[in-house]
Amino acid sequence: MIDNRKNVSNKFLCCSFCGKNQNEVKKLIAGMSVYICDECVILCNNIVQEEKKQLEFSLYENMYLPKPCEIFNYLNSYVIGQETAKKILSVSVYNHYKKLKNLKSNNKVELGKSNVLLIGPTGSGKTLLAETLARFLKVPFIISDATTLTEAGYVGEDVENVIQRLLNKCDFDIKKAQHGIIYIDEIDKISRKSDNPSITRDVSGEGVQQALLKLIEGTISAVPKKGGRKHPQQEFFHVDTTNILFICGGAFSGLNKIIEQRVLVKNSIGFNVDINNKLNINNKKNFLSQVQPEDLIKFGLIPEFVGRLPIISVLKELNISELIEILIQPKNALVKQYKLLFNLEGVELEFNENALISIAKESLHKKTGARGLRSIIEHILLDTMYSLPSKKNVQKIVINDGVILRKEKPLFIFN
């Protein structure tokens, strides 16, 4: 019988790379007339990883990384209010890209990801903040709606399609995609549907959280080159999500009550107090600002998912004065946009102060926040924009509060 540790000529097998024989190494892997030992496999892997790091570093080596105050000031140009949220995002994004810029560092301490969770009502500026950040940093950016996502194999959009869309955004440049920003909206809508995680298969709730968890914490995602569902015959792009920054946002309706219950119970322990009186004292208090991970878990997010979103920022509901500022102040303010639109017709458009107040009040009443401002203006200007191109010698159009409150027609001033 031939010793299985020797070849036919009774000689020891040797690694084709380092020359060590099979007795000097733990394992020898055979190929087409060549062999490689376990030590050389590890060495080759280290070389590949080092080259990968060098490539990633070269992307950001010469990149100018704006300081948190510069990011904050840029956000201020487009987003009104939400000072705390802007500051939190500025620092988080700065730290994230500072980490990428210093990938070449030999520091043994591994820096974690600064993924962010934005909590706030509809129209408070969550999506706008994320969009403005990506535009300023000039990195690939997409918005995904969590309500359309399902587990792989079920009807709906696979979670990994989010990465497919990011690749599309940067013309399938994998290196760019691996340093982009993904904003997942309506994240509160994928909360667990039951307190009992095993009661039923929750493919659009806990199942999606589990699938997103892998992407957010960092994994190699296999994305079909032609998009669509995966099948064995497809070719794939392999995207490392480790350095993709994830920002999740949601209104989290009902979370306020969960926090309120925790805070009031905690404050009442050991004291003979009337909970109802306590509630009356605190009824104007914004409990959302006191949110803790335990509250999000009780709301329906799984603990592992909450743990991957270490930075939580709460956005408050916009008031009337802030809504008026949104109408007139930012670089791309709505009033400025409509004035430009009318200027293209050779007509000056004017909103008086009372009109702006009425628009802001209506948006506040409808609870649509800044998002509802455009639809209100579009509605009151619809007939005017329809008839204006057919009118001659129009010099100016004035919008007053009567147009909003009493459905009056705008004032036309002719040459």
Curated annotation (Swiss-Prot):
One cellular component term from this protein's GO annotations in UniProt: HslUV protease complex
Gene Ontology biological-process entries: cell division; proteolysis involved in protein catabolic process
Keywords: ATP-binding, Chaperone, Metal-binding, Nucleotide-binding, Zinc
Superkingdom of source: Bacteria
Residue ranges of every copy of the ClpX-type ZB domain listed in the record: 3-56
Keyword Nucleotide-binding annotated: yes
GO MF entry, a single one: unfolded protein binding
Pfam families in the record: AAA_2, ClpB_D2-small, zf-C4_ClpX
Binding site for ATP: P121, T122, G123, S124, G125, K126, T127, L128
Amino acids binding Zn(2+): C15, C18, C37, C40
InterPro entries: AAA+_ATPase (IPR003593), ATP-dep_Clp_protease_ClpX (IPR050052), ATPase_AAA_core (IPR003959), Clp_ATPase_C (IPR019489), Clp_protease_ATP-bd_su_ClpX (IPR004487), ClpX_bact (IPR046425), P-loop_NTPase (IPR027417), Znf_CppX_C4 (IPR010603)
PANTHER family: ATP-DEPENDENT CLP PROTEASE ATP-BINDING SUBUNIT CLPX-LIKE, MITOCHONDRIAL (PTHR48102:SF7), ATP-DEPENDENT CLP PROTEASE ATP-BINDING SUBUNIT CLPX-LIKE, MITOCHONDRIAL-RELATED (PTHR48102)
Entry similarity comment: Belongs to the ClpX chaperone family.
Function field: ATP-dependent specificity component of the Clp protease. It directs the protease to specific substrates. Can perform chaperone functions in the absence of ClpP.
Subunit-structure text: Component of the ClpX-ClpP complex. Forms a hexameric ring that, in the presence of ATP, binds to fourteen ClpP subunits assembled into a disk-like structure with a central cavity, resembling the structure of eukaryotic proteasomes.
Protein name according to UniProt: ATP-dependent Clp protease ATP-binding subunit ClpX
Native organism taxonomy: Bacteria, Pseudomonadati, Pseudomonadota, Gammaproteobacteria, Enterobacterales
Encoding gene per record: clpX
